[in-house]
UniProtKB/Swiss-Prot annotation:
<dbReference type="GO" id="GO:0051301">
    <property type="term" value="P:cell division"/>
</dbReference>
<feature type="binding site">
    <location>
        <position position="196"/>
    </location>
    <ligand>
        <name>UDP-N-acetyl-alpha-D-glucosamine</name>
    </ligand>
</feature>
<keyword id="KW-0573">Peptidoglycan synthesis</keyword>
<dbReference type="GO" id="GO:0030259">
    <property type="term" value="P:lipid glycosylation"/>
</dbReference>
<dbReference type="InterPro" id="IPR004276">
    <property type="entry name" value="GlycoTrans_28_N"/>
</dbReference>
<dbReference type="GO" id="GO:0071555">
    <property type="term" value="P:cell wall organization"/>
</dbReference>
<dbReference type="GO" id="GO:0051991">
    <property type="term" value="F:UDP-N-acetyl-D-glucosamine:N-acetylmuramoyl-L-alanyl-D-glutamyl-meso-2,6-diaminopimelyl-D-alanyl-D-alanine-diphosphoundecaprenol 4-beta-N-acetylglucosaminlytransferase activity"/>
</dbReference>
<feature type="binding site">
    <location>
        <position position="166"/>
    </location>
    <ligand>
        <name>UDP-N-acetyl-alpha-D-glucosamine</name>
    </ligand>
</feature>
<protein>
    <recommendedName>
        <fullName>UDP-N-acetylglucosamine--N-acetylmuramyl-(pentapeptide) pyrophosphoryl-undecaprenol N-acetylglucosamine transferase</fullName>
        <ecNumber>2.4.1.227</ecNumber>
    </recommendedName>
</protein>
<keyword id="KW-0472">Membrane</keyword>
<feature type="binding site">
    <location>
        <begin position="10"/>
        <end position="12"/>
    </location>
    <ligand>
        <name>UDP-N-acetyl-alpha-D-glucosamine</name>
    </ligand>
</feature>
<keyword id="KW-0808">Transferase</keyword>
<dbReference type="Pfam" id="PF04101">
    <property type="entry name" value="Glyco_tran_28_C"/>
</dbReference>
<keyword id="KW-0133">Cell shape</keyword>
<keyword id="KW-1003">Cell membrane</keyword>
<dbReference type="InterPro" id="IPR006009">
    <property type="entry name" value="GlcNAc_MurG"/>
</dbReference>
<dbReference type="GO" id="GO:0005975">
    <property type="term" value="P:carbohydrate metabolic process"/>
</dbReference>
C-alpha cells in the first residue's frame, strides 16, 4: 500500500497524522508512506524524529481581505500545487490522507486532480477553512464531532470516526492507575492542566481551589501549570498552606509525564477543550470542567466544549467568565453530587470513540482497494 499523509502547522494536525501512519504500518508493515508538510511548521521537527520519510512543499494560509501577504500566499499555493502534482506522479500513492493545516490544500487537490482517492480528517466541531474547501473534492471526509457535519457542503461524503487516542491512554485502567500513583480507592481525584504551555487564567483560578482542598484527606489534587506558568504560580501558593512542592494531597508541577495514569485515576478534569484532549476525556468517560482557549482559530475550542456540555458530559466556563470562586463553586457542586458526576461520566463515555483509529484505517483500506481486516 502506498499512502501520502499531509498535515501540519500545529500538533493538533500533526499527531493525528502520525497516529494514522503508525496504524497503517501495524496493519501493513510493507506499506510505503510519505509525510508531506511545509518547511515552516512544527512537522519539520516532529516528523523526522519518527523515522517517517518527510517531504516539504511550498504552502501558506490565506487571510481575509486583499494584502501583499495574501498575494504571496496565493503564489506560494500555486507553487505548492505544482510541486504536489509532480509528487503524485513520482510517488504514485493509492490514497492521500489530509489531517488539516494549509499544506493539505495543494496536496489533496493535486491528488483529486490526478484521480487518486483522498480522505480528509477534521478534528474539531467547527471545521477549518481548508477542510471545508477540500471536502468538495475528497473521496471521504472523516469527522470527530457530529456537529461538524453541518458546516460542510452538502456534497461532502461524511463519516463520523472520532479522533485517534494514544494507546497508553486507551489501555489505562482506574484501579491500576491509582495503585501505580499510590492513590487510595476512596479518594476524589481532581486533575487540572492548561496544555504544555499552561494557561495563566486557569492557573490564577486554581488558587482558591488549592486553598479549599489543601490537606483534605479525601481529595487528591494534581495541577500542571505549564512550563511558562510554574515560576509565576509557585509564589501565589504562599500563605495558602501549600508550596510548589505541595502537601501530600496536592501536587503542582510544570508538566505531568504520567498523564495517562493521572487521567485513568481522575474523577474530574479541568482543562482546555482542544480536540485531542476531548477525545481522551470521552474515550475514558471522564467528567470535565472545560475552559476553551479564547484565541483558537474560529473559536473552535468553544464549539468543541459545547458539544460535550450540551450533552451533559461537561461543565463549560468561558475564559472571560473564569474566576477562582466560580471555578471552586463548580468543582464543589460536582464533588458534593456523586449522582450528577456519575451521569456526566456516562454521558462522556457515550460520546467516546475508542475505535477511531480502526475506523479511519478501514476507510483508507477500502479506498485503496485492500478491504478490511
Amino acid at each position: 500500500m502506498r499512502v501520502i499523509i499531509a498535515g501540519g502547522g500545529t500538533g493538533g494536525h500533526i499527531y493525528p497524522a502520525l497516529a494514522i501512519a503508525e496504524g497503517i504500518k501495524r496493519r501493513h508493515p510493507d506499506a510505503d508512506l510519505l509525510y508531506v508538510g511545509t518547511s515552516r511548521g512544527l512537522e519539520t521537527e516532529i516528523v523526522p524524529r519518527t523515522g517517517l520519510p518527510f517531504h516539504a512543499i511550498p504552502a501558506a494560509g490565506l487571510k481575509r481581505g486583499l494584502s501583499p501577504t495574501n498575494l504571496a500566499a496565493v503564489l506560494r499555493a500555486g507553487r505548492g500545487l505544482g510541486a504536489s502534482l509532480s509528487l503524485m506522479r513520482r510517488f504514485r500513492p493509492q490514497v492521500v490522507v489530509g489531517t488539516g493545516g494549509y499544506v493539505c490544500g495543494p496536496v489533496v487537490l493535486a491528488a483529486a486532480l490526478r484521480g487518486i482517492k483522498t480522505l480528509i480528517h477534521e478534528q474539531n466541531a467547527l471545521p477549518g477553512l481548508t477542510n471545508r474547501m477540500l471536502s468538495r473534492y475528497a473521496s471521504r471526509t472523516a469527522v470527530t464531532f457530529v456537529e461538524a457535519a453541518g458546516h460542510f457542503p452538502a456534497r461532502a461524503r461524511i463519516i463520523l470516526t472520532g479522533l485517534p487516542v494514544r494507546p497508553e491512554i486507551l489501555n489505562t485502567r482506574r484501579e491500576q492507575a491509582r495503585r501505580h500513583l499510590g492513590i487510595p480507592d476512596h479518594a476524589f481525584v481532581l486533575l487540572s492542566f492548561g496544555g504544555s504551555r499552561g494557561a495563566r487564567s486557569l492557573n490564577q483560578a486554581m488558587i482558591p481551589v488549592v486553598q479549599a482542598f489543601r490537606e483534605h484527606p479525601g481529595v487528591r489534587l494534581f495541577h500542571a501549570t505549564g512550563t511558562a506558568g510554574y515560576d509565576e504560580f509557585a509564589p501565589l501558593l504562599k500563605g495558602t498552606g501549600s508550596t510548589a512542592k505541595a502537601p501530600g494531597n496536592i501536587v503542582v508541577a510544570p508538566y505531568f509525564h504520567e498523564i495517562a495514569a493521572l487521567l485513568g485515576a481522575a474523577d474530574l478534569v479541568i482543562c482546555r477543550s482542544g480536540a485531542s484532549t476531548i477525545a481522551e476525556l470521552t474515550a475514558l468517560g471522564l467528567p470535565s470542567i472545560l475552559v476553551p482557549y479564547p484565541f483558537a482559530t474560529g473559536n473552535h475550542q468553544e464549539y468543541n466544549a459545547r458539544a460535550l456540555s450540551e450533552r451533559g458530559a461537561a461543565v463549560l466556563i468561558l475564559d472571560r467568565e473564569l474566576t477562582g470562586q466560580g471555578l471552586l463553586a463548580a468543582v464543589a457542586a460536582l464533588w458534593n453530587d456523586p449522582r450528577k458526576l456519575a451521569a456526566m461520566r456516562q454521558a462522556s463515555k457515550a460520546l467516546g470513540k475508542p475505535r477511531a483509529l480502526d475506523s479511519i484505517l478501514d476507510i483508507i483500506e477500502k479506498l485503496a482497494g485492500k478491504g478490511t481486516r
